[in-house]
Amino acid sequence: MKDREAISELIAASARQLSREHYNDAQIEAAIAHVFGVDSNLIEDGSYFVAESSDGLIGCGGWSRRKNLFGGDQYSARDAGYLDPQSEPARIRAFFIHPAHARKGIARAILSRCETEAQTHGFRALELMATLPGIAFYESCGFRKIGDYDLELTVDVKLELVPMRKEMRHPQITQITQTEKT
């Protein structure tokens, strides 16, 4: 995929700039090396989206019907098996926004597209693994924390993450009309 290198660069820039208040340099660099990265399954499944502007790629994110909750191709603990939409939540995956375009509605637009597509495929709930800088955004979109998770990246480096969940409403109403008198 031609966007793969640009997505990788966006992920690294986003992690390095937007995570500084929550993680130290060792955590950020280890996360980029071992976890944060392009997930080929999302691209192959057609469920990974990019936002573009005249500046190039400014955001990316996706959803998945696969069991893997987080991690790019380089992450060793991946599970590419499929979820059952009747009993398991779809996954929200790999959201990264270019630092120059953060907090401008890009992630919200991508998330809205992901929610709609997951619902279209029969899913009734969503789960994700949030980094600390993403928690407030996901809470503002209706997700709630369901635990805590410390990911061991190296012998000396751990990354605090937060699993989150959202129950989806019924498909949105597209039109309400007045009934005619008979």
How would you label these PLM feature ranges?
Residues M1-E9:
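A short beta-loop-alpha structural element at the N-terminal edge
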Residues E180-K181:
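Short, intrinsically disordered C-terminal tails of secreted or membrane-associated proteins
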